[in-house]
């Protein structure tokens, strides 16, 4: 498998992998390797671990708020845009292993690719050193966003805000038309 110098990335993460192959797998986009040696399985695991860590954090830090509010707060932290911003901060695009064709199409700069790879790295950290260490790393990486989190603020996605606004004005709920992205 292709090797990259990942020491700069590990420094940005504040974490040194015991099994460096886990990090390489987490960085390997499916365009580079269609076999099982790509980051999709680690992304699946990382997504679950990230949601669990943030859920636990919110549960402990905001003990008096209800489940719906915690769900909205978690969604404001764990989403493609948020993870994309975190990935840009650590220059993750410089480390993603992709096919040359995908790189020419600027695939290493796409939100989905960066946020998915970020989740894969969380999954790799979990497999490398377990939940406790992963929790410390995630909380450190999200520290700035967590500090700015305010339980009094309403955390709603734009669709929910639109529906509630229309409902308050006694309008019928909107009808949504979805299109397929290419």
Residues of each region from the PLM?
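Double-stranded RNA-binding/processing signature
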Residues: 1-182
């Amino acid at each position: 498998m292709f090797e990259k110098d990942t020491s700069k990335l590990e420094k940005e993460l504040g974490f040194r992998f015991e099994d460096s192959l886990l990090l390489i797998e987490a960085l390997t986009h499916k365009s580079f390797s269609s076999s099982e040696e790509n980051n999709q399985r680690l992304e699946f695991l990382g997504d679950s671990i990230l949601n669990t860590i943030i859920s636990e954090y919110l549960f402990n830090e905001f003990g008096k708020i209800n489940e719906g509010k915690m769900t909205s707060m978690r969604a404001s932290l764990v989403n493609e845009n948020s993870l994309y911003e975190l990935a840009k901060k650590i220059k993750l695009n410089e480390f993603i292993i992709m096919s040359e064709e995908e790189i020419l199409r600027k695939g290493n700069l796409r939100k989905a690719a960066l946020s998915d790879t970020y989740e894969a790295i969380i999954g790799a950290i979990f497999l490398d050193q377990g939940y406790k260490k992963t929790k410390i790393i995630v909380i450190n990486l999200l520290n700035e966003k967590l500090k700015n989190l305010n339980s009094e603020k309403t955390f709603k996605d734009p669709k929910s805000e639109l529906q509630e606004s229309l409902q308050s004005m006694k309008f019928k709920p909107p009808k949504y038309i979805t299109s397929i992205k290419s």
